[in-house]
Amino acid sequence: MIYQSPTIQVELLEDNIAKLCFNAPGSVNKFDRETLASLDAALDSIKQQSNIQALVLTSGKDTFIVGADITEFLGLFAQDDAVLLSWVEQANAVFNKLEDLPFPTASAIKGFALGGGCETILATDFRIADTTAKIGLPETKLGIIPGFGGTVRLPRVIGADNALEWITTGKDQRPEDALKVGAVDAVVAPEALEAAAIQMLKDAVAEKLDWQARRHRKMSPLTLPKLEAMMSFTTAKGMVFAVAGKHYPAPMAAVSVVEQAATKGRSDALQIEHQAFIKLAKTDVAKALIGIFLNDQLVKGKAKKAGKLAKDVKSAAVLGAGIMGGGIAYQSASKGTPIVMKDIAQPALDLGLGEAAKLLSAQVARGRSTPEKMAKVLNNITPALDYAPVNHADVVVEAVVEHPKVKAQVLAEVEQYVSEDAIIASNTSTISINLLAKSMKKPERFCGMHFFNPVHKMPLVEVIRGEHSSEETIASVVAYASKMGKTPIVVNDCPGFFVNRVLFPYFAGFNGLLAEGGDFAAIDKVMEKQFGWPMGPAYLLDVVGLDTGHHAQAVMAEGFPDRMGKSGNDAIDVMFENKRLGQKNGKGFYAYSVDSRGKPKKDVDPTSYELLKAAFGEQKAFDADEIIARTMIPMIIETVRCLEEGIVASPAEADMGLVYGLGFPPFRGGVFRYLDTMGVANFVALADKYAHLGGLYQVTDAMRALAANNGSYYQA
């Protein structure tokens, strides 16, 4: 053994080829400070051996290296620029040391080689992947750029255009795609991986492969004619900005770094990368996006822990077909859990099966599935007009019409047909789980399971704990949601649960602006373009449906009359009473039609303005700051109330619920990250300016105390 540490082992194989194996404790390899230090020491040990002729990098795990240890980032990025620069330079010195070894090097890549893992393989002369490999630089998704030489080496290996696509999108690349552009030199079967890498090194030692020319090219300026370079980078900037927009600076910074470094050798090019990396690491956007990644890990960790308590869900059932039932059935069946779809009407079953078939056909058309896989998924969905096939289900999801009496009747019925230990969940968006539980003989096996529409696209599922729900029930539904490919958060029962409870105060703020003559299209523009929501409030209400919004608003007003009660008609009432239901009937705040390509088209509708003018008088202009304040303050305060009341367990889970359930702008990180970035004291001062507007604008005592102590909701 040449070198050994808890994360890396180096041994000498036949023909004087050394093998460096990444094999950290735990399930995956990642670049934390300990592993970087071990790699540095391992390379020093290798350099001291006079007989080594080549080096192969391997992994003792199912994956190569998943990337840097992101849990270290927020603490590290909070350091002074000088400390951060020192860390980046020391890390890069290790990768340079690997690249400068006086003999050929190769990486044998299996599973993920992402971020720092990808930058490791780029520092070697040859790269051989097996068929399980996924290679990529996802750093821009975290608001930063690669910091271990990725922006320097990748363009010199696969060309600037290909490298910019990899870096700015942050997507994982399949081995065959990596081979096409030259990121890897061969793709082999998993069992042949190490032997293929060693053979390539033997060929390099025997001078059949020119490893020195390859290395020289990686360390030199890019070979791009000046005019071609100018055109390439100008085009890239336009394309990248069109996708990333002004709120996500990292992709544009990556283009700029690659462009500036194009004419430089390795040392100067790396300095350009270092400076851009540090600048981005200090941004609020990076903090927010890294925070989302860490929050996602926390939520997934909780779901994994729940799996230990959970009942194994081998089969499921959904009661109520149609679009929602069909979406749930599709999601369950496509992720491998067979499901019975039960309804009282054949046309509804046909609609549900049609919805599943439509989603699957779209996947086949895009090349993401095959007709054989489509048939298998559809065979996993069993339509039924009676309860007989439901009796074998481990979990039953009730998804009938959103009416308490109808739901209570269906829940009482199904309980008679299912097994004693079957779990029953209601896909309700507003009706109290404790209220529905009263219709059941065994309320301990009942909880809420709130999917968001469209089911196949929306990642969040709210699992609602009623006062009688057992831990096994909650754990089993969390595990089932995870198995369906969803991100579950557990919330306690209250009107609107978590997501709708915090959404409707936002709509109330919007209604307040319209009641004073605000222009809904102007408000949407501010909330989309400046705050960063995917849809402004008027457009979102049209998509949700004004009938749904009207009903949910009444539920919230009844549940929280002091804050959400109404004294008269608002804009939602005006639209609903005039049968303007939104996209579903082609007219809401906006008018909807289909363009020449068959795609939905949204237009401002003069009729909406006439109706609002008749109800609320002449239009009045509001500036962007006031629009943002009056819509967001109620949502933020209600989110804080949910945390204080224990409706949601942590700031992390609340923020993930907002990002995944409502599309809260990821670059802002969620309500609690937004509050910490703004400063709780600054927010309290802003809210106090609008406190005269009512209870929704009045901060809690605990918020005021936190502000007085200069506190924050996150520790980092």
Curated annotation (Swiss-Prot):
GO terms for cellular component: fatty acid beta-oxidation multienzyme complex. It comes from the Bacteria. The record marks 119, 139 as: Important for catalytic activity. Gene3D superfamilies: 1.10.1040.50, 2-enoyl-CoA Hydratase, Chain A, domain 1, NAD(P)-binding Rossmann-like Domain. Substrate binds at residues 296, 500, 660. In the N-terminal section; belongs to the enoyl-CoA hydratase/isomerase family. In the C-terminal section; belongs to the 3-hydroxyacyl-CoA dehydrogenase family. This is Fatty acid oxidation complex subunit alpha. It comes from Shewanella sp. (strain MR-7).
